[in-house]
Regions:
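Enriched for short, Lys/Arg-rich terminal
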Residues: 2-4, 8-25, 49, 57-65, ...
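PIN-domain endoribonuclease scaffold, especially VapC-family toxins
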Residues: 24-32
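A short, surface-exposed loop/turn module that caps and links secondary-structure elements
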Residues: 32-59
Length: 85
């Protein structure tokens, strides 16, 4: 699968690379798991509602979430820092 970071999510990822390598490792593990099993697996995947209808969330930790959408053979990452706004 191909990973596509959307605007803010790439900035989030770069933030973690600079400030917390532990979160980068966790995000990479989640992305690898998503490519194998998009809607089950690590990080307690759950479908989102309202403005994020069609998207899924996985826990990075208690505060931060990885929000993504699977389209064909692409994983679109929308956020990987904070909760949904």
């Amino acid at each position: 699968m191909k990973y596509i970071f959307v605007d803010e999510s790439w900035e989030d990822y770069l933030y973690w690379q600079k400030n917390n390598k532990k979160y980068v490792k966790k995000i990479n593990e989640l992305l690898k798991d998503i490519s194998r099993q998009p809607f089950t697996g690590k990080g307690k995947p759950e479908p989102l509602k309202f403005q994020y209808s069609g998207y899924w969330s996985r826990r990075i930790d208690a505060e931060h979430r990885l929000i993504y959408k699977v389209k064909d053979d692409e994983i679109h990452i929308v956020k990987c820092r904070f909760h949904y706004d």
